[in-house]
């Protein structure tokens, strides 16, 4: 049975050393009830990341939104996260699946690489992500993933597909039409005057 959590807005936090501001931003955005929220931080300070992740995890639990950690299985386990999202350099997928157990979410970044998506599914991924779909301010040098990957993925893979990279309300519908079940978004929500309202607007795209 498909995981009903894996459809809708996949909100990703901006990278910020200012914990107070970040937590306040997340609290506002969660009012829009995204499907998932991912804590993503490239800060080198492990203590800062742990502190931020714990506070955001608590907000997600209160809001009833699954909390995912980017890049770090260790941090996901330390914060009792609902799942982890791993890229190419973030460890063995089979080991991550075993450590998480069957009830938590394992997501895999596949860039524009079809074989990696197939391997991720074989390792027990709950969803696979392709991107960047559009040019992205968050990762300007990211490879581009054509919408045809989503068309093929919907036809040939048994897990939901996440789209990431430059997604906005203006271009989201075509990505959903191609086959994406999750839209991973940072800037278009967190840069909005009302992040909660912006997040809620994405939800309506999936209700149509």
Curated annotation (Swiss-Prot):
Catalytic activity: 2-[(2R,5Z)-2-carboxy-4-methylthiazol-5(2H)-ylidene]ethyl phosphate + 4-amino-2-methyl-5-(diphosphooxymethyl)pyrimidine + 2 H(+) = thiamine phosphate + CO2 + diphosphate; 2-(2-carboxy-4-methylthiazol-5-yl)ethyl phosphate + 4-amino-2-methyl-5-(diphosphooxymethyl)pyrimidine + 2 H(+) = thiamine phosphate + CO2 + diphosphate; 4-methyl-5-(2-phosphooxyethyl)-thiazole + 4-amino-2-methyl-5-(diphosphooxymethyl)pyrimidine + H(+) = thiamine phosphate + diphosphate
Residue positions binding 2-[(2R,5Z)-2-carboxy-4-methylthiazol-5(2H)-ylidene]ethyl phosphate: 136-138, 166, 186-187
Entry superkingdom: Bacteria
Pfam families according to UniProt: TMP-TENI
GO molecular function: magnesium ion binding; thiamine-phosphate diphosphorylase activity
Spans traversing the lipid bilayer: none
Function, as annotated: Condenses 4-methyl-5-(beta-hydroxyethyl)thiazole monophosphate (THZ-P) and 2-methyl-4-amino-5-hydroxymethyl pyrimidine pyrophosphate (HMP-PP) to form thiamine monophosphate (TMP).
One GO CC term on file: cytoplasm
CDD domains: TMP_TenI
Presence of the UniProt keyword Metal-binding in the record: yes
Sequence positions that bind 4-amino-2-methyl-5-(diphosphooxymethyl)pyrimidine: 38-42, 70, 109, 139
Pathway in which the depicted protein is active: Cofactor biosynthesis; thiamine diphosphate biosynthesis; thiamine phosphate from 4-amino-2-methyl-5-diphosphomethylpyrimidine and 4-methyl-5-(2-phosphoethyl)-thiazole: step 1/1
One of the GO BP terms on file: thiamine diphosphate biosynthetic process
Protein name stated in the entry: Thiamine-phosphate synthase
Binding note for cofactor: Binds 1 Mg(2+) ion per subunit.
EC number: 2.5.1.3
Cofactor(s) of this protein: Mg(2+)
Family statement drawn from the similarity comment of this UniProt entry: Belongs to the thiamine-phosphate synthase family.
